[in-house]
Every structure is written in C-alpha cells, then in structure tokens.
Amino acid sequence: MNVIDTDDLEKHTPMMRQYLTMKAEHHDMLLFYRMGDFYELFYDDAKRASELLGISLTARGKSGGDPIPMAGIPYHAVEGYLAKLVQIGQSVAICEQIGDPATAKGPVERKVVRIVTPGTLTDEALLQERQDNLLAAVYQGKVGFGYATLDVSSGRFVIAELDTKESLEAELQRTNPVEILYSEDFGELGLLSHFKGKRRRPEWEFDYDTSIKLLLAQFGTKDLHGFGISDARLSLQAAGCLMQYVKDTQRTTLPHINAIIRFNQADSIVLDAATRRNLELTQNLAGGRDNTLAAVLDNTATAMGSRMLQRWIHQPLRDPNQIIARQTAVNELLKTGTHEPLHEQLKALGDIERIMARLALRTARPRDFARLRQALSLLPELQQSLSVLNAPHTVKLCQYLGEFPEEQALLERAIVDNPPMLIRDGGVIREGYNNELDEWRGLSEGASDYLVQLEAREKERTGINTLKVGYNRVHGYYIEVSRLQSSQVPLNYQRRQTLKNMERYITPELKEYEEKVLSSQGKALALEKQLWEQLFDLILPKLHELQAFARAAAELDVLSNFAERAETLGYICPQLSQDIGVQIDAGRHPVVERVSQTPFIANPVTLHNQRRMLIVTGPNMGGKSTYMRQVALITLMAHIGCFVPAERAVIGPIDRIFTRIGASDDLASGRSTFMVEMTETANILHNATAQSLVLMDEIGRGTSTYDGLSLAWSAAEYLAQQIGAMTLFATHYFELTQLPDLMAGVYNVHLDAIEHEDTIAFMHAVQEGAASKSYGLQVAALAGVPAKVIKAAKHKLQQLESRDHQLEGTKTPIQTLLALPEPAENPALTKLQAINPDNLTPKQALDLLYELKRLS
C-alpha cells in the first residue's frame, strides 16, 4: 500500500487516518508512531524496519478492509534502534502523544516532535565520538559547483566554490559527509554513489535570494560582507538549502550556528581524492581507521581535539607563518614539559564543543550540565598550567579560554552532584536552589514516615498482624491484608485489588493523603522542569564565549598531543625553506615503523631545483611504495605543524601532493584498472606545477609492454621537462633508468637487495643509481609459487634474454622508441584547433566542415 496516498482516508479507522496524514508529511523517512509504551510502524515502514532492524513483522487488525503490517519497538530502547538506522543513512520522524488519553475523544493528539537524520544528530549516544558528523549540500552551476558543509553538533559551517568535478570529488573525500543534499538537476550523481545518506531536494530550496534571506536571518546581519563570502554564489545556494533542511528537522532556533567560513583551496595544500585514499590519512583502504596516519598521530585528550586533528591532517597549511606559529607552540610545550599536566587537565574537560551545541538546541541532558560545570571548575587550574608559556599562538589561545565564575556558581547551586540521565523523572535540581520546590518535595518525601506511622496505628486498631501499607504506580497507596484475615477488616476499608493470597484496601484517610502526595509530586516535577528550562536561558547568553573556549581547548589539545608524539616517537621539528625542494635525512614512514615487527630502515630523499625527479627502481617488496609514501607523509606532517620522523627535514613550499600508487577496477563506474590509472595520471599531468610533490608508481603496467613503456617514458619526460614538479617515479621499466643521461634534473635511486643462490634479502635501503635487476622470480618463490613454475619461468627468461641480445644493433626498446620520427603535422587538426565555435554562424560552420573534409 502507498501510505502517502490520502485520497481515500475516510475508509480507514480514525487512528489510521491520523497516522496516514502524518506519514504523508514525512513520506521520505520512517515514522515512529507512539502508542503507549511502544513506537509502532505500519505498512511499508513496518516491512522496511523489520528488514533493517531484525524486528518481528506482524499485523494489527484491518483498516480500509486490508490487514495492517506492523512492527514495534519499546520506547525505552529507541536510542539503540535509532543508532542502527542512522548508521545506514536512514532518517526517522518521531511522533509522540501530546494529548491526555483520559480526556481524548477519539485518537489521542499526536505530533512529530523530533526528526533524526544522519547529518543532523546531536545526541551523544548516536554520534561517533571522534569523527565530525557533517551534513553537506552540493549545487551545480553552469560552470563549477557550490559545496557547503554543516556540523550541527558543533555549529561549524563551511562553504567552498569548486571549479571542477575533480575538485568536488576531493572535497567529498576530505569532508566525508554522512548525509548529502543535492538538487533535482544535479548531473554528477556518480560522485555520490558510495554515500549512504543521499537526499534529493527540490530546486527552489537552492534559490539564491531565498538562501541569502535565510543566512542573514540566521546570523542577524544586514549583509554577508563581514564573512567574505558575498561573491560565492553557488556555495551560498548550497548553504541556503542546508539551513532550510536543518530548520525543518530541528524545529527550534539554532543560535550555535553563528558564523560561516569560506574554504579557499589556495590556503592549503591541495590533496585530490586519490591522494587522500592512497596515503591512508584517516581511513585505510579497507575503510577502517587502523594503520592510518591519524591513528599514529592521535593521542589527544579530548574527542573535540581528535576531530580537529583529523581536519588539520586533511587540510595542510601553505602559509609558513601559521605553520611556524604551531611549531613554536609545540616546541615550548615540549621544552617546558607542560604537555604532560595539560593532557590530564584537558582529559577532564570532556566534549564541551558538542555539549554547547546541545545547550543551544535545548536538547542538553542533566549530565551535560554536570560536565560543563566540571569543565568550568577546571579553568583556573588549566590557566595556571599555561601561565608559564610565552609562545604568541599559545598566549592567544589562552585568551579565549575565558572566565565563567557566575555560570559555574549557578550550576553548582542548581544541579545535584550525580544527576540522572533525563529530566523527566526529576531529581536533577539541587535542594536549596528553589524554596517552593523544596516545599513540594518535602510533602512528597514525608510520605515514607507517614506510611510507617499509619501501618503501626492500623495494626494496633484492627489487631490484624499481616496488615501492611504499600504503594505502586498502577494502584497508588493501599492497605494489604492476608486472605485469611480479610474478614477482620473494618467497615471503612474499601476493596481496591484482589490477589491470590492477599486483599488490598483503601480508606478515605489514605485516599486523601494519596491525592495530596501525588499532587505535590506532580507540582514538584512540573516546577523542576520549569527551573530546568530557565537554566538554558541563564547559560545561553555566554554561548559564543563558551564555544570559543571549546575551540581553544581543542587546539591546545592538538598542540599538546604533537608535543607528546614528538617525545614518545622520536620526531624532530622540520625546517621550512623558501626554496623549492624536499630534503629529508633518515626519514621514516610514521605508520609502518609503528606496526613493523623489525627495526625500520630510515632513508633519505633529496629534491631541489637541480634534482627534481628521482627514478626509483628495485625489487617488488623492496620498499619502493613505502619510501615514496613516507616522503609524502613527512611533507604533509610538516605542513600541519607536527614534528616528523626523521633526523633532519627541510621542506620548501608545496602547493599540491599527487599520488598515483596502486589501482583497482572501479566497478561502480565501469572503469578498468588501467583506465583508473590513466585517469589519475591525466589529472596529475594537467594540474601539477613546479611546486607540486608527485608520486608515480608503476605507470603503464596495465597494458602491453611497449604501450606501457611509451606512456611511462612520456609521462616522466613531461613531468621533468614541461612541469618541473618534484617527482618520485617508481618503475619496473629499466629502460627509464636512461632518462638521467638524456634530461637535466633527473636522477636514479634504487632500493637495495642481496641475492643468495635462489633466495633474496631485502635491505630496504635507498642507494644512488639504478637497480641491477628486478628479482621478480625470487619474489615469486618467496610468495610460494610452486618450484616447477619457477623453474619453467627461469628457462623462459633465459630464452627471452638470449633473443633480446640478438636483436639488430642491440638497440634497447627505448632507443628504438626514441628513433621513431616525429608525427607529421595534420593540417585538418591545426585548422580545427584554431577555431572558436562560439563565433561561427551556421553557414560558416557548414563551409568549415567541407574544408576540414578536404584537408583530411
């Protein structure tokens, strides 16, 4: 059944009419419909929930003549089920009973009070603690894309204007949003294929004028000039869609979203999607976090510090002043030993960033206030530890920590030491905070003494020794007497409940007291909830200052973490140079050295204006890929302000890092391994500059020998002579080792290995010059290839080598390649390249077509 079809509602029961009407308003998400102690799902929602959550699918009678498929979950277990759903990209509308069942005529009044989507989560139980939870929107213009991300759990709002599809792909890889909004006419759906939470939105939600009005209203400004984003038209359209979506789902004000930042690619080293993937920065090739750069560098004290570190890793700085400011701060923390006590103090702060977001949305829980109270109480001690530091960047961060004595004192007075998880049952507001609340609680809490006295008095009056006075939530207060003695009860005892061996009674006196106590409990709880809401009003005026405190604490955490990692892992402070180049002495791969069972062999690299390309040769498993990756990772670490695994490192200006390392079939896009390889190569050749660091590994291996050799040769030549990029070019084509003899700035290096009889020992040491051979058969033997196959391969190798020596003039394949004449100029192609089709009339275009036919 199509549950959003409301044309024939009259044939359904009143309750199902209510359900179907609400479902029509939330047709693209599951509707959790509260019925007593359960959330129920019906029709297609029930079937889908049963499939996704593994819960039973049943039926609830009939409505409109048809059985109603139904599934349900207990209300007290809802958070666990919500967590499962949002992890797979599913959104949920939660419909609660807001009317009183006792007074309702017909179905109890219900209302959707909360919408849970993957990208708008703020509940601590549903969020990944150490990962940003980004909602994104993308809008495609005639030229380029607008991209916006918003972390509702922190208030961080960022936009970017992107010129190309490749830039958008890189941003998607960098930000890794959990939910993406896109317009109806978005033309690059292939880029979104592997994201779970995709939402197609109507075109009007991306309207420019509407977007501007939404943003101005949100920030309370007359224009957007102060944010430096007035000309970012496409990304502002995406940002407007985000704001509309968040307002629709949160259904409250969003005061913690009070600024918007423009991400400018020119401010950071550009890392394309392939590079982020190949270097395994925050996610390994299997999709996990183990054995990534982030896993090695992250020993932060707080979750908010961990999230900031990952953003830094994906956004290495280009401005040397910003990098040096971080380095200076880390150096001082290290030399003074301040990082050790600072780490412990920050650990006690908790995740203030997300707590402040929940406060702003008024969804904070009692324990959030208790954690904020603890964080504020730690501020004097934290500032005392930092007072010995003089690095300008650290001093600036300390200024943002602020002082909040009034807010701390308020929370000390208002919240009990160990509050319950929820406000709904009371027990959150401390005794002495409000006199009226204390009075109502006194009436309720005095009930125990009263009941003890009543029980003793009634036993004495009636002579019934089995008499007890008790209470439960269903029947209230009662006097309980055994069945054997029930005939002795006085006439004023009114039977309330009959059990197997007991009778329960109520008296007019006990009934009157019950009403008084229950009334006081209800009034105490209502007043406590009112005082709870007032706490939000008293804390929120300091929202912006508390957010600044959270950001400063997170950055201090990252810097302190860098100091600890440098000390623990033996890292040194890299030197920044104005001259193009990368000089690393005894560099180590930061990840491999941590997981390797044997001592890591450190290696150098030298790249500069006169030495721009290294042709890297050596056996498989010899360490070529590890060597190349470590150069890129050390360079990246230097640009986030982190110390690096080396004895010495001098790093010049870098604008981009490219890696073409490893490849596999892209089945989703229908691209072969070779096609993926060539696409990545084309991206490098089009976008690399003289300030780029390029890693190229085994170009051309996915095609025939001569095709592959030709492509590898030409790519290396183009990088060396046309672009002049700093390049590590690993290859098994030994013909490429002749390049240094033919081109300036190109040098050979190789990974050493020692052969002994039929075995090989990998030395993993980088040496100048070309490798003597590839040792392919020995590696195959180590891998367990059968001895018969190895023997046959040796025989075939001898035949091939013998034949090669007999070739005419003993020319190498590359000499043959170089001897080929330059292709003749094609007049038709020359003519075509000179044409601007936008300037042609239809008649001119037709005449030109005939001329091109003649020239060809």
Swiss-Prot record:
ATP binds at G618, P619, N620, M621, G622, G623, K624, S625. PANTHER family: DNA MISMATCH REPAIR PROTEIN MSH1, MITOCHONDRIAL, DNA MISMATCH REPAIR PROTEIN MUTS FAMILY MEMBER. This protein is involved in the repair of mismatches in DNA. It is possible that it carries out the mismatch recognition step. This protein has a weak ATPase activity. CDD domains: ABC_MutS1 (cd03284). The gene is mutS. Signal peptide: none annotated. One of its GO terms (cellular component) is cytosol. This is DNA mismatch repair protein MutS. NCBIfam families: mutS1, PRK05399.1. Keywords: ATP-binding, DNA damage, DNA repair, DNA-binding, Nucleotide-binding. Pfam families: MutS_I, MutS_II, MutS_III, MutS_IV, MutS_V. GO terms for biological process: mismatch repair. GO terms for molecular function: ATP binding; ATP-dependent DNA damage sensor activity; damaged DNA binding; mismatched DNA binding. InterPro entries: DNA_mismatch_repair_MutS (IPR005748), DNA_mismatch_repair_MutS-lik_N (IPR007695), DNA_mismatch_repair_MutS/MSH (IPR017261), DNA_mismatch_repair_MutS_C (IPR000432), DNA_mismatch_repair_MutS_clamp (IPR007861), DNA_mismatch_repair_MutS_core (IPR007696), DNA_mismatch_repair_MutS_N (IPR016151), DNA_mismatch_repair_MutS_sf (IPR036187). SUPFAM superfamilies: DNA repair protein MutS, domain I, DNA repair protein MutS, domain II, DNA repair protein MutS, domain III, P-loop containing nucleoside triphosphate hydrolases. Belongs to the DNA mismatch repair MutS family.
